Amino acid sequence: MFDFQVSKHPHYDEACRAFAQRHNMAKLAERAGMNVQTLRNKLNPEQPHQFTPPELWLLTDLTEDSTLVDGFLAQIHCLPCVPVNELAKDKLQSYVMRAMSELGELASGAVSDERLTTARKHNMIESVNSGIRMLSLSALALHARLQTNPAMSSVVDTMSGIGASFGLI
């Protein structure tokens, strides 16, 4: 059904490095109930130690940072994760505005004449991932809003059908 292929680019390794730089390893290891050196080793691509899925889940939950999961998904050519537990149908405008903000950041980086440094590359990737998350949450919030108002859902379905019959969609 799906044809996942592992990327030749070290997305997961880069995500591990970024995660390690972003967080205090001693405090995080204590909160996770891990030895700090074990945590450092598992975040170091040069070491043979690897995270187990429950460890990835725990670190993502403790830090509210999806960098490791996004790196894992990018390694198999998948889009970043979308935390649907943050979904609130009344935040549709907020999701759209944040998505557009991230798109603006990406556009700014794309038209810049500055050299593409590693830091700029990571910032652009983070903007893309955040934008995808916000657009996905926008779509889910819109869907939830339409499901709670059947009349609105019927109007949208009718207009979509009329538009499709005239070749507008």
From Swiss-Prot:
Pfam families: Phage_CP76. One of its GO terms (molecular function) is DNA binding. InterPro entries: Phage_186_CII-like (IPR009679). Signal peptide: none annotated. Keywords: Activator, DNA-binding, Early protein, Transcription, Transcription regulation. Transmembrane segments: none annotated. Involved in the establishment of lysogeny. It comes from the Viruses. This is Regulatory protein CII. The lineage of its organism: Viruses, Duplodnaviria, Heunggongvirae, Uroviricota, Caudoviricetes.
